[in-house]
Amino acid sequence: MITCLPLLAGEGARRKGDIGMRNKNKRLAQYATELRRNMTDAEYALWYHLRNKLFCGIRFNRQVIIGHYIVDFCSRKLKLVIELDGIQHVEQEQYDLERTKFLTAQGYKVIRFWNDEVLKNIDNVLEAIYVEIEHLSPPHFGSSPHKWVEPRLEVLK
């Protein structure tokens, strides 16, 4: 025999804990939006190559929420996270290790680059990302390690 008891006050579709989590996620989403609007020079330089599936036809998003973290760039399909580190990351090494551990536990591969590296040597950064994509993709992916951008035809009027 199954007995149905009436809901107690605060039970049902909304609980106090749920509201707190929703507010936390909303704040995180607002912060991610703010970060997208105010990219660093290095983030902008890399995003120029990753946006609109320009890089190997892979979709990347910027400032993506995973758990309670915001990552710089992410391909959810490949479960690849790209993080760009500035000088502040020297002081928050433990925090970055915890983030990476969490993301890895969620099945993501995390690769990191220094902002200076992106700004001064974007080709090497793109090559390193390409190599990771090759490892994470099916065997038929790509034909040449130096041709990471698919050619696009432009119609001239």
Swiss-Prot record:
Gene3D superfamilies: VSR Endonuclease
Source domain of life: Bacteria
Record-linked Pfam families: DUF559
InterPro entries: DUF559 (IPR007569), Endonuclease_DUF559_bact (IPR047216), Restrct_endonuc-II-like (IPR011335)
UniProt similarity note: To E.coli YcjD and H.influenzae HI_0925.
UniProt name for this protein: Uncharacterized protein HI_1162
UniProt source species: Haemophilus influenzae (strain ATCC 51907 / DSM 11121 / KW20 / Rd)
Lineage per the UniProt record: Bacteria, Pseudomonadati, Pseudomonadota, Gammaproteobacteria, Pasteurellales
